[in-house]
Structures are given as C-alpha cells and as structure tokens.
Amino acid sequence: LALFYQHNINDNTKLGIWQIEEPEDFFLASVPQHRAITHPHKRLQHLAGRYLLKHLFPDFPYEEIVIADTRKPYLPYEQYHFSISHCGNYAAAIVSRKERVGIDIELPTGRIKKISHKFLNIQEREHFHVAGTWLQDKADTSLTLNDKSLTVLWCAKEAVYKWWGWGSVDFSDHILLQPFEIKTEGSIAANFIRMQRIFDLGLQYKVFEGLCLVWLSSAA
C-alpha cells in the first residue's frame, strides 16, 4: 500500500497522503464511484482520496457523501468533517470527528508566482519578498526557495478556503497570513474575515521533497 505520510493529530483527527501507484481497479474494489469523471487520472485521484478517508477511519461512511453547491463534499449528518486534496500522483485527506478541517497539497512549480498577485495582499507580498522578484537561494539551484515558499502560502489559503466550505472567498482580502519564517515544517497564524466576523486560525505545514502540505482543524 502506498501510504506516503500519516499524522494522527489526536484521537479524533487524522490526516494522510496517498502516493498513487495502484491501478483504478484496486480502489474500485473498495470505493464506490459517485459521479462520472471522464479523465482517467482525475478519476484515479478521486478514488484514491475516497479510499484514504476509510483508511484513516475505517467506519467512515463515504457512501453518504454529498456535494454542496460550492463543490465541497460533506456528510449530511456530520458524523465526520473532512477535506480532500489531489495533485499529480498524490491524494491527501484530513478527517475529524469533532472539528471542521481543511487540507491542501501542491507540487512546487513556478506557475504559483504568476498568480501570486491574485492571492497575496500587499503586506504579505512585502513580508515574503515576492513583489516582483524571485528570492535568491544559492543552496538550491534546481528549485528556488521562493517556489516552495509561494506554494506553502498558496496551500495555506486553499486550506482555509476548504475549511470554510461556503465559497465566495477573496484570497487576498479575506484570508490574511501573519508573518512567519518558512522552514521545512511549522505553524502559520491566519485571520479569516467573513460574515462580519474575524476567525483566528492556526495552520500547520510540512514541505517534503517536491510536495507541500498545509492543514488546519478548528471549530467554526
């Protein structure tokens, strides 16, 4: 089995990353396919994410999953809160019995820089030095520090968006990341502003070789 990473946050909340090496039939033997997905690889990612839910909590009722108008999957009776993310040959999921959760994984690439102005506000761009130039990392010439840094920031905002689950979020205006030093793993303080409320959120992140992961679990 290709479990790439698992972190049991506590008895009620677990997350994992699955490295997809199995054929589609492996997942179909255990996971019902709820919706028609024509693209073979996207279908494989979808099945791997559903499979991972049951791997983390064997009694997870994935046959009860429904999709909200915002495209967020959820359980109507909220026996579990969960969030799923896919990229490349990876699927990630976080599941909790008690708290709302969000997760995102991404492969670090230069494309994130091209859209950084859309998801980072002025203060964030100034603090993380992404206002028009790449950060210089002489120790890594193949993949600059800034590729990884920007991917962590993007994942953080995506994880908050998935935690919220109600759509209609402006990443630069509604999600504010507090300054922090980006390392291989750590925590991120964020403020989420919606519905005339400010939510103080604590996210965690981990940077693997060629993969960034960010997650959060918090009561709404």
Task: Label every model-predicted segment.
Residues 1-220:
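Core catalytic alpha/beta fold that binds nucleotide/phospho-ligands
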